[in-house]
């Protein structure tokens, strides 16, 4: 099994798709890396030679920030927004949508499941 950037790539998949299992590499970046290294996108991971694996590893490590480094950078950016008191940081802190989406309805992914509030009680007549 090929191991790139600390991630085991699935053996049966095409290398173009398998590279997207690495955090920070999508389909476009995957194609860029393959073009840069000269490896065919149709090659299966199990058919990669040791030399091809090492060139892939080197190309990804030199060109992109991936996996742990990228995750920590994103986390630090969010923390910085919170620390300086930016509006976006406030939205992150409160667990609300950051990019201007509406919250009167929807936004359930960000807010979590509904918290049911008891309705108003009717006063009984005497």
Curated annotation (Swiss-Prot):
<dbReference type="GO" id="GO:0015935">
    <property type="term" value="C:small ribosomal subunit"/>
</dbReference>
<protein>
    <recommendedName>
        <fullName>Small ribosomal subunit protein uS13</fullName>
    </recommendedName>
</protein>
<keyword id="KW-0694">RNA-binding</keyword>
<feature type="region of interest" description="Disordered">
    <location>
        <begin position="92"/>
        <end position="126"/>
    </location>
</feature>
<dbReference type="GO" id="GO:0000049">
    <property type="term" value="F:tRNA binding"/>
</dbReference>
<dbReference type="InterPro" id="IPR019980">
    <property type="entry name" value="Ribosomal_uS13_bac-type"/>
</dbReference>
<keyword id="KW-0820">tRNA-binding</keyword>
<keyword id="KW-0689">Ribosomal protein</keyword>
<comment type="function">
    <text>Located at the top of the head of the 30S subunit, it contacts several helices of the 16S rRNA. In the 70S ribosome it contacts the 23S rRNA (bridge B1a) and protein L5 of the 50S subunit (bridge B1b), connecting the 2 subunits; these bridges are implicated in subunit movement. Contacts the tRNAs in the A and P-sites.</text>
</comment>
<dbReference type="InterPro" id="IPR001892">
    <property type="entry name" value="Ribosomal_uS13"/>
</dbReference>
<dbReference type="GO" id="GO:0019843">
    <property type="term" value="F:rRNA binding"/>
</dbReference>
<dbReference type="InterPro" id="IPR010979">
    <property type="entry name" value="Ribosomal_uS13-like_H2TH"/>
</dbReference>
<comment type="similarity">
    <text>Belongs to the universal ribosomal protein uS13 family.</text>
</comment>
<dbReference type="GO" id="GO:0003735">
    <property type="term" value="F:structural constituent of ribosome"/>
</dbReference>
<keyword id="KW-0699">rRNA-binding</keyword>
<dbReference type="GO" id="GO:0005829">
    <property type="term" value="C:cytosol"/>
</dbReference>
<comment type="subunit">
    <text>Part of the 30S ribosomal subunit. Forms a loose heterodimer with protein S19. Forms two bridges to the 50S subunit in the 70S ribosome.</text>
</comment>
<dbReference type="InterPro" id="IPR027437">
    <property type="entry name" value="Rbsml_uS13_C"/>
</dbReference>
<dbReference type="GO" id="GO:0006412">
    <property type="term" value="P:translation"/>
</dbReference>
<keyword id="KW-0687">Ribonucleoprotein</keyword>
<dbReference type="Pfam" id="PF00416">
    <property type="entry name" value="Ribosomal_S13"/>
</dbReference>
<dbReference type="InterPro" id="IPR018269">
    <property type="entry name" value="Ribosomal_uS13_CS"/>
</dbReference>
């Amino acid at each position: 099994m090929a191991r790139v950037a600390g991630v085991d790539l699935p053996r049966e998949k095409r290398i173009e798709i398998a590279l997207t299992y690495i955090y920070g590499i999508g389909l476009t970046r995957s194609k860029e890396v393959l073009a840069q290294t000269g490896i065919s996108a149709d090659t299966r991971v199990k058919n990669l030679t040791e030399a091809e694996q090492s060139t892939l590893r080197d190309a990804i490590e030199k060109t992109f920030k991936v996996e742990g480094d990228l995750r920590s950078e994103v986390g630090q950016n969010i923390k910085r927004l919170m620390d300086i008191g930016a509006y976006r940081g406030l939205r992150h802190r409160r667990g609300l949508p950051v990019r201007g989406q509406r919250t009167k309805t929807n936004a359930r992914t960000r807010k979590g499941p509904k918290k049911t509030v008891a309705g108003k009680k009717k006063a009984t007549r005497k």
